């Protein structure tokens, strides 16, 4: 950054705020993890500067110490969608920890990204059918989507415009009891009401795609582009 039980799913789709200059919601609580992604070339450990020691493992295909447009971060090369075999070296993973689960707390994920592509999962913990729920940010068609799936419902919110324009964008998705908000570059662009309920699973945080996939029955949804940092905050 230089510059676990069965549930009934009710999906609530985000309501886009168009033509508003509303500023992003206030910061949610305190940092849980801060991954600045400033490691040297060839590094295999992503350092957490948030103080909890939630360091990550950098896959061998991830380009560290990548400088572009005033920022140093990680580069994820494009891989052909749904083409086996899976490429786990394309991912950065952080082992499961209670602090990384949203639980029932206010919880926010912030990511700074730059891409010209239109596909892939940015960051997630868990997958669609796992016990305990999951969350993820993804960028289908260049539109950033944020999903939180919990014990009560699933709530989805989407950016109103494409962000795959080759520029750096800071995206923040926050889950509150009232619903989910999405901000882009400091401005709230969408909200979706609804309480997700508790989210707590035993999966790692994965950056750049899925950890459990085969590219045949389950696509790995590998991200292509650059990331400057990822930060998680909670109450």
Segments the model singles out, each with a brief description of its role:
Residues 37-44, 51, 114-119, 128-130, ...:
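Acidic glycine-/aspartate-rich tracts in secreted/extracellular proteins
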Residues 35-36, 48, 107-115, 171-173, ...:
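Short hydrophobic/aromatic patches on beta-strands that form ligand-binding or substrate-lining surfaces
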Residues 71, 192-226:
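Flexible glycan-contacting loops in extracellular carbohydrate-active proteins
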Residues 1-26:
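Secretory targeting and sorting signals
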Residues 5, 25-87, 190, 201, ...:
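Extracytoplasmic low-complexity segments
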Residues 146-170, 217:
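Short, aromatic/His-centered strand-loop micro-motif at the edge of beta-sheets
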Residues 29-32, 41-46, 82-145, 180, ...:
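Extracellular glycan-recognition modules
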Residues 167-181:
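Localized edge beta-strand/strand-to-loop motifs within extracellular or lumenal beta-rich domains
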